[in-house]
Regions:
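Enriched for short, Lys/Arg-rich terminal
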Residues: 61-62, 68, 73-89
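Basic, Lys/Arg-enriched alpha-helical interface segments
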Residues: 1-64, 78-80
Length: 89
């Protein structure tokens, strides 16, 4: 699958705040984006195309349940390609 991951301005603001608070957040997000490019259909579907995915923040030390929730919006051009927008965290 070849999915491109893009961010919204709102997501960038929220991610910047979390990156200042948790040192591992940038590395965690990089791993998350790589995972999302391979499998954009992970997480719980809230409505068609919109998904909620749990993200563990390593420096927070509480696993996925105490980590962040990332809201994504997926647009599929075909089954093997499309775009994933990171909407909120």
């Amino acid at each position: 699958m070849s999915f491109e991951v893009k961010t919204t301005p709102h997501f960038e603001r929220e991610a910047k705040i979390l990156a200042k608070r948790y040192k591992s957040f940038k590395a965690d997000m990089k791993d998350f984006v790589e995972s999302l490019e391979k499998n954009p259909m992970q997480g719980d579907e809230l409505s068609p195309g919109i998904r909620k995915i749990r993200l563990a923040i390593v420096s927070k030390g509480k696993g996925k349940s105490g980590g962040a929730r990332v809201i994504t919006y997926t647009i599929c051009a075909s089954e093997s390609e499309g775009r994933v927008y990171l909407v909120d965290v």
